[in-house]
Amino acid sequence: MALYDEDLLKNPFYLALQKWRPDLCSKVAQIHGIVLVPCRGSLPGSVQASCQFESYVLVPTEGHFQTLDGKAVVIEGNRIKLGAGFACLLSVPILFEETFYNEKEESFSILCIAHPLERRETSEEPSAPADPFSLKTIEDVREFLGRHSEKFDKNIASFHRTFRECERKSLRHHIDSVNALYTKCLQQLLRDSHLKVLAKQEAQMNLMKQAVEMYVHHDIYDLIFKYVGTMEASEDAAFNKITRSLQDLQQKDIGVKPEFSFNIPRAKRELGQLNKCTSPQQKLLCLRKVVQLMTQSPSQRVNLETMCADDLLSVLLYLLVKTEIPNWMANLSYIKNFRFSSSAKDELGYCLTSVEAAIEYIRQGSLSTKTPDAEGFGDRLFLKQRMNLLSQMTSTPIDCLFKHIASGNQKEVERLLSQDDQDKDAMQKMCHPLCSCEDCEKLISGRLNDPSVVTPFSRDDRGQTPLHVAALCGQASLIDFLVSKGAVVNATDYHGSTPLHLACQKGFQSVTLLLLHYKASTEVQDNNGNTPLHLACTYGQEDCVKALVYYDVQACRLDIGNEKGDTALHIAARWGYEGIIETLLQNGAPTAVQNRLKETPLKCALNSKILSIMEAHHLSSDRRPRPSEVPAQSPTRSVDSISQGSSTSSFSSISVSFRQEEVKKDYREVEKLLRAVADGDLEMVRYLLEWTEDDLDDVEDAISTVDLEFCHPLCQCPKCAPAQKLARISANGLSVNVTNQDGFSPLHMAALHGRTDLVPLLLKHGAYSGARNTSQAVPLHLACQQGHFQVAKCLLDSNAKPNKKDLSGNTPLICACSAGHHEVAALLLQHGASINACNNKGNTALHEAVMGRHTLVVELLLFYGASVDILNKRQYTAADCAEQDSKIMELLQVVPGCVASLDSVEEADHEGYVTVEIRRKWNPKMYNLPEEPLRRQFCLINPGGRFQERTSRETMGRDRSVPDLAGRSLQEPEKQRVTGKQSDLSDLSRYQTSEEGNKGLPERPVSRQAAPGHRPMVRRHTVNDAAILQVPEVTVHLTTHEASVPQS
């Protein structure tokens, strides 16, 4: 069938032909010829009498056609080729063909062509026809659908079987069920590759929608229309009572103009076919044909004046009363509620609005047998206002519901969806479900047939349900509510997209996790073959990729290809999403799968960096055993990093005052949690640890489980219950204190990566701040090593011990000073960190700061009283490790003398303050650094107010006259550091055991160095910015010679 259609009786060219050349019309009928009629959209304007109509009348001859003026024409397929006699030998498309009969029953054919024959080759193409494409009969639909109709028959048969079980459901239920059937059939149609291309054109997509709707409704018409008729029985009876009382109504009584009376019988006959139409689309086409007939001229030679809205409504009122249709209300409800394919704003929608306004006018009792003069002007005004109002009512109840969902207005959503609950309550109050007594009929009347009632199954013109809209707009709070109301999690729209598809496409991770929790399928493919994972990779939504993969790597298949054969890894590699690629590779995404172009993900790599990542994983996967082949626990440590997936994981139990957790879980679950913490993905951490919103609200008032001893392990008393709730183990076996094979807990990872938002939450949920990894490092070590000030402060405020040592003997202060983080070092000193503690090499924090050439840290330690005379195991002091004539050497020589000279200063107030301007005295040009922390004011902590005299246990420096037998330069000591194999794990590998550098070193004599606890200095400086205006500056006059350190 043709894709284009129009009413040729209203075509300007055909009307002009009948008006100006009726002789040609008679002749073509006598010879059974063909008339060529250009489509309405191709005509420039009115057709004049000077037009060469003879060129458009074809007479059949041998093998071809000839026009009445002797020009040659050939018809080949669906095109007309002009021959001899035409100025331009064009090829004109044939749009469609119709057969007409005259009064003598003589037939002739009319071919509607794309444009006039006089059009030149250089002229512009005709504009689109004014009328939209449309299908008229069920035969046209079957011809259009072809073999696809067989697939629809199976769905329709299934609908017939289930309809009987739900026959007494509400009208909204049946609207939703028919819409679901329509959506399913449309999805099957759009899977056809050829039709999928055509669907990109709006006109063709509308045509497909019309075809599917008409075919579906044709087969279920008896069921649905019978049900609607039952629902509207009382309304139809009331309306019929009114129309039956108006049978004496005359045309003049309602103002029908005489010139329109001629067409009323034809329009009435056409309207009588309404109940023979088996779909809303056909019924609307019937109404449009009625309107067209009423505006048609009684004679083709006489044009009627344009019909205005008043004239149209007058004729419609007369037809509604006089036509023997007993179920107007059922037809109106059926057309309005079961029309899914078209918009209410098109021409058919206008016809429906006009009929609806006329019906409403009659229902109001405004129509009577009064003469037009006696009829009140207000009644006619009401009719026009009613029609205008109906034409403006484009917002349906579904639109209102979706608008509230998109804006997150949960109260309105609950109110709209609670209307369906009222129906259920009414059913429960009935005598029995099938009761039809007077009381029960009153109870359910007005509700079952209320189309304004919306449900979680309702769909819009795109086939989307409320759950689709909530997922598309990221309204996570509404997901729970809609699912609790029965929303179908895996419902698909016209394009085959589920809510999970839309959530992943838009990057709403919280919505994705919720949908997965409610068993949303990750394997559903849309019309393009894309799963939710494909869309998440296409749009670079890394958080959603992790949610899909981490939720259940077994359920989320990574090898599914779309219609192009591309897997998720193909797409991520093509767009260069490094984080997504690593996530997919870590969870077993295949790198050797080929798409339809025979391309592997390696070949699709965007650049060399992406290629190297995949090649490295491809090679390592060939050598590495599968996870199932690796034992649950192994004495050797994994070579792979956390980001590349450990070969195995174990859960370590931390033995403190709370109960011991013993969890056995696959290593993948632990790696998921640690990666989520490292990435700062709060939503994923919440999901894996099963933290609820209430848990996050309760952490402010909760008691830390670290310092709480339970009455017994299962105690739920008021004292233990809050801590039990926060320290619970989730269903997947994960908890806040779970560790991997290397001993890293979530708190370790949060401290290492500076996740200031996660550290407080982990601590409040029972994370142990003293947990040690295999290198015996606590989270505070990692935070200080990386210089994460806020994390270190949070840990110290949570009673983390500042003097714990790792396997190498390093304290958090030594780690901070080694890396040059002076602010973190100052924080540790304020919290009582031991300033002279030594590691396994005998190095103090000052040694490490000097070897790292961190001037500010050295100055900080000296002013806090760090000893410059302590020897390490190589018998070096801090000064021995400094470069000669350097700024650090000057500090080591001058500052201790400056601090010692403060002992002779008498202070009236033992709590006085000393400003650190000493460095300006001995070298004012040395420090002009911005934001130096030691330009702040320091307060003397010891209330004694003065330093004690040095005792006989004073530490002595090494005699410089002794030759250096170590074979190393005093000015350039080497600082040993451990480097990891993986670049992204350099921070973790720093804490691995490294004892080779200490082997064979002699122990230093005890008498050469005092223990840190016996330092002669008993007062310490702390930062105090507020004191700068409270105490006068204490000036110490020292010369370089006076402050110098004497040589031994």
Curated annotation (Swiss-Prot):
One Pfam family matching this protein: Ank_2
CDD domains hit by this protein: ANKRD27_zf1, ANKRD27_zf2
Residue stretches of biased makeup (Basic and acidic residues): 618-627, 949-962, 996-1006
UniProt-listed PANTHER family: ANKYRIN REPEAT DOMAIN-CONTAINING PROTEIN 27 (PTHR24170:SF2)
Segments for region (Sufficient for interaction with VPS29): 396-460, 692-745
Annotated stretches, region: Required for interaction with VAMP7: 658-707
UniProt KW Membrane keyword: yes
Region spans: Interaction with RAB32: 451-729
UniProt region (Sufficient for GEF activity towards RAB21), positions on chain: 1-372
InterPro entries, sorted: Ankyrin_rpt, Ankyrin_rpt-contain_sf, UPF0507/Ank_repeat_27, VPS9, VPS9_dom_sf
Protein name: Ankyrin repeat domain-containing protein 27
ANK repeats: 396-426, 462-491, 495-524, 528-557, 564-593, 597-627, 668-698, 742-771, 775-804, 808-837, 841-870
Bias type Polar residues, positions: 979-995
Protein encoded by which gene: Ankrd27
Compositional bias segments (type: Low complexity): 638-650
Region Interaction with RAB38, residue ranges: 451-600
The VPS9 domain, residue ranges: 233-371
Localization (cell): Early endosome; Late endosome; Cytoplasmic vesicle membrane; Lysosome
Listed GO CC annotations: cytoplasmic vesicle membrane; cytosol; early endosome; late endosome; lysosome; melanosome; neuron projection; plasma membrane
Subunit (UniProt): Interacts with RAB21 (GDP-bound form), VPS29, KIF5A, KIF5C, GOLGA4. Interacts with RAB32 (GTP-bound form), RAB38 (GTP-bound form), VAMP7. Interacts with low affinity with RAB5. ANKRD27:RAB32 heterodimers can homodimerize to form tetramers. Can interact with RAB38 or RAB32, VPS29 and VAMP7 simultaneously. A decreased interaction with RAB32 seen in the presence of SGSM2.
